[in-house]
Each structure stands twice: as structure tokens, then as C-alpha cells.
């Protein structure tokens, strides 16, 4: 998992250490008018790499309303555009989780795991404010969309699905 902000002083250095498609994607997203973009899923091609841009208007909710998720074919680049904050928790895929809903063979490329109380001991946590991004690789189980102690908040977020194969 990688965390950063497209507006901070170190953005160029942070982006430069990423695989080429992710670096290009961050620069592209930073230059787009995402606040006024239509919601939905859109195909996007950068340097010959086919990606999927998802633009969503959502509301955060408590941790127990979410299930841990993972992807295998895509790297998830999640960027908070406005609103929030949006809390993400994450932990490594150690192969011990119980599958609740496997949709890896669908275009959504998503698998949900059962919530387990013991994962709370190993979950990392980041709080996304506008401009913050989190990048999740296939080994990063993540739980986005959570509210902070102040309760549910509306937010707009981007999820850009970048093929893992393009990042190798």
C-alpha cells in the first residue's frame, strides 16, 4: 500500500518511484477536473495501457458496514477528490482470510472477505483528505469508505483500475 497527496511538496518524488503506469496516472488525475466529472465507470488509455476510471459520489459509514476487499488483476489507485474525510484500513493478505464473495472472474475483479475481530489488531489506518491517494496492490487487503469519529460524511472519490501486468 502506498499513500500520498497530489498537492504536497514531495509529489514529484513520490510519483517518480512508482511503476510507469501509476506515475502517469497520478499526473493525469492531478490535471483533470475531477470535481465536475460525470459519475460512472469510463475506459481510459494512457501510453497504450487500458485502465478503468470510476468516479463515485458516496457517503462514509462505520467500519462494521464494510468488508475487507482485494483485487488480483488490477492495482487500485484511490483518490479523494472532495468531502470526507474517508478512513481506509488495510492489512497484508496472509492467506488466512475466509472468502465471503468471490467476483475475481468478473470485470469488477473483487473478492470480499469475512470480517474477523482479530484483524483489528493488525489493520493499518490512513485518513484521506481531498488530494490524498492510496494505492492498493493485489496483496493489500483494504477496507475503504469508513467514517471517522465525527460520523458519516459525503465524499467524491476516484478509483483508477490499473492492470497489474502493466506495472511489472
Question: Which residues are covered by each model-predicted region?
Answer:
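Short, structured patches in soluble enzyme cores that scaffold and shape functional sites
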Residues: 79-81, 138-140, 146, 160-164
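Short, solvent-exposed loop/turn positions at domain surfaces
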Residues: 122-123
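Conserved metal-binding segment of the jelly-roll/cupin
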Residues: 126-147
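Non-heme Fe(II)/2-oxoglutarate
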Residues: 2-5, 64-66, 76-78, 87, ...
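A short hydrophobic beta-strand segment most commonly corresponding to one strand
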Residues: 133-135, 151-168
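A short, N-terminal "cap"/entry segment at the start of jelly-roll beta-barrel domains
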Residues: 1-55, 65-70
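Short, conserved beta-strand element in jelly-roll/cupin
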Residues: 72-86, 92-94, 103-118, 161-162
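Conserved short histidine dyad/triad with adjacent acidic residue
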Residues: 53-71, 81, 85-98, 138
Amino acid at each position: 500500500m502506498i499513500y500520498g497527496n497530489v498537492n504536497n511538496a514531495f509529489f514529484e518524488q513520490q510519483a517518480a518511484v512508482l511503476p510507469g503506469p501509476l506515475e502517469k496516472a497520478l499526473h493525469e488525475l492531478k490535471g483533470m477536473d475531477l470535481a465536475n466529472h460525470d459519475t460512472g465507470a469510463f475506459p481510459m488509455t494512457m501510453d497504450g495501457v487500458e485502465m478503468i476510471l470510476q468516479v463515485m459520489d458516496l457517503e462514509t459509514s462505520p467500519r462494521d458496514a464494510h468488508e475487507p476487499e482485494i483485487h488480483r488483476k488490477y492495482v487500485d489507485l484511490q483518490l479523494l477528490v472532495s468531502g470526507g474525510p474517508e478512513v481506509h484500513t488495510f492489512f497484508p493478505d496472509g492467506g488466512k482470510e475466509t472468502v465471503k464473495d468471490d467476483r475475481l472472474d468478473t470485470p469488477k475483479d473483487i473478492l470480499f472477505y469475512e470480517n474477523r475481530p482479530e484483524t483489528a489488531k493488525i489493520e493499518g489506518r490512513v485518513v484521506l483528505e481531498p488530494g490524498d491517494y492510496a494505492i492498493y496492490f493485489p496483496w493489500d487487503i483494504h477496507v475503504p469508505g469508513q467514517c471517522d469519529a465525527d460520523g458519516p460524511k459525503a465524499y467524491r472519490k476516484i478509483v483508477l483500475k490499473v492492470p497489474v501486468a502493466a506495472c511489472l
